[in-house]
């Protein structure tokens, strides 16, 4: 979806962020020898969806700013985009984490694995959507030309400021 909706380089960043989230979440379960059951699997799948949604929000802002801020470097555009989405991402993640802490404390023993997986996954997913996906774009040398709309033949294009 991201390769078609945005650009191939964005999809590489998103997949890298998703792999990062899943590996760290499963690593925590392995490190602390926590039982892995179907509820944990459901939580890992939810983490993938949550992280992908965050990554899409950040990627959309990066794409939008590449088209708006034409004279800046890729690093500057990505920095502005991350700054603009940081408050939204942190508030969303913190409210989710508060609910997950309550779920862990009051949810009972059967739901602990689910809550732990989501706690770790949301925390790591927030980090990866901001830092991992954007840095992969920089490593792949994202440029303004990658995101410019194609010019249709015979159509006059207005100059943007």
Predicted segments with their positions:
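Hydrophobic alpha-helical membrane-associated segments
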Residues: 3-4, 20, 50, 54, ...
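Short helix-capping/hinge motifs at transmembrane helix termini and TM-loop junctions
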Residues: 4-6, 32-34, 106-108, 141-142
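Short helix-terminus and kink motifs of transmembrane alpha helices
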Residues: 6-13, 38, 57-60, 64, ...
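Hydrophobic transmembrane alpha-helices and their membrane-interface caps
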Residues: 10-63, 120
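Pore- and gate-forming transmembrane helices of large, multi-pass membrane proteins
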Residues: 14, 71-106, 116, 122, ...
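Transmembrane alpha-helix detector for multi-pass membrane proteins
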Residues: 41-61, 83, 87, 91-98, ...
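Hydrophobic alpha-helical transmembrane segments of membrane transport and translocation systems
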Residues: 106-161
């Amino acid at each position: 979806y991201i390769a078609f909706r945005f650009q191939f380089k964005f999809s590489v960043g998103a997949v890298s962020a998703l792999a990062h989230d899943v590996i760290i979440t499963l690593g925590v379960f392995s490190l602390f020898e926590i039982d892995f059951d179907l509820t944990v699997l459901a939580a890992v799948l939810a983490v993938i969806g949550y992280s992908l949604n965050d990554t899409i929000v950040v990627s959309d802002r990066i794409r939008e700013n590449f088209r708006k801020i034409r004279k800046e470097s890729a690093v500057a555009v990505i920095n502005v985009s991350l700054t603009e989405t940081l408050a939204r991402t942190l508030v969303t993640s913190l409210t989710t984490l508060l609910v997950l802490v309550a779920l862990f404390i009051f949810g009972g023993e059967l739901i602990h694995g689910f809550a732990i997986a989501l706690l770790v996954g949301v925390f790591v997913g927030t980090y990866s959507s901001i830092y991992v996906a954007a840095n992969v774009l920089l490593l792949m040398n994202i440029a303004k030309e990658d995101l410019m709309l194609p010019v249709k033949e015979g159509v006059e294009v207005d100059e943007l400021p």
